[in-house]
């Protein structure tokens, strides 16, 4: 229930004294197989209710999924009084990007080429500007760092040296997000990689053979990783 969720998050924010951030995941409910549009609409409504709860003394909301009119003598105020904890969001479809641009604070991405990451950032920035907002960006990626590039590459190869591709495929397909657009894009990136699994210098995609979701790692020595992140 969004109102109870708002109170739970506010309580955690007080316990953590403002160090709390929230990652919004637009997943199916148990036993449900909703379209991405429906899941994003539900997320949109939940976020709007959270923001009302954290910034007002009442909740007055009517949408497709929720119809709430709640007055409270016990305001749901988080520790962070700038609108509540920062909201992180990841999604590659147009509705997902638009939701993030309108309501969230940080757009999260999975590994990709620098060119493609730049394209996503420009797209979301333009969408946010249309709402009079700015959005920050985050990247989830694994790191394999050793004293030398040779050692780092050897460590990467060791991770998958005993991987059975059939089992890896089964592991990926069992994940709840296995059929999402984001996971499909990770597979496309992996297919574009060279014989060693690098889609561009330092970006190694072979780790995605054994897991769903974030399917690549930065591989190199400390200076190389630092330079790539910059």
Residue ranges of predicted features:
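Glycine-rich, histidine-containing beta strand-loop boundary motifs that form or position
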Residues: 7, 16, 20, 24-28, ...
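Acidic (Asp/Glu)-rich catalytic clusters
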Residues: 9-20, 101-102, 126-132
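Hydrophobic faces of well-ordered beta-strands that scaffold small-molecule active sites
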Residues: 20-24, 87-90, 105-109, 135-141
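An alpha-helical appendage that flanks or caps ligand/catalytic pockets
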Residues: 36-83, 112-230
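Long hydrophobic segments that form regular secondary structure
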Residues: 93-116
């Amino acid at each position: 229930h969004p109102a109870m969720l708002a109170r739970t998050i506010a309580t955690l924010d007080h316990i953590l004294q403002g160090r709390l951030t929230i990652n919004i995941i637009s997943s199916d409910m148990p036993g449900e197989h909703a379209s991405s549009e429906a899941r994003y609409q539900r997320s949109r409504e939940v976020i709007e209710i959270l923001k009302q709860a954290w910034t007002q003394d009442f909740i007055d909301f009517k949408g497709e999924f929720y119809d709430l009119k709640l007055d409270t003598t016990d305001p749901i105020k988080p520790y962070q009084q700038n609108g509540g904890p920062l909201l992180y969001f990841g999604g590659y479809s147009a509705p997902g990007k638009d939701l993030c641009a309108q309501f969230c604070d940080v757009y999260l991405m999975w590994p990709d080429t620098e060119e493609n990451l730049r394209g996503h950032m420009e797209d979301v920035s333009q969408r946010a500007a249309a709402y009079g907002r700015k959005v920050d960006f985050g990247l989830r990626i694994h790191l394999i760092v050793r004293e030398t590039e040779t050692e780092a590459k050897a460590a990467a190869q060791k991770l998958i040296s005993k991987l059975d591709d059939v089992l890896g495929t089964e592991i990926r397909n069992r994940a709840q997000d296995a059929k999402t657009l984001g996971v499909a894009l990770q597979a496309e990136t992996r297919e574009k990689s060279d014989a060693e699994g690098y889609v561009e210098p330092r970006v190694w995609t072979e780790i995605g053979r054994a897991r769903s979701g974030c399917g690549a790692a930065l591989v190199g020595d400390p200076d190389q990783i630092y330079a790539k992140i910059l």
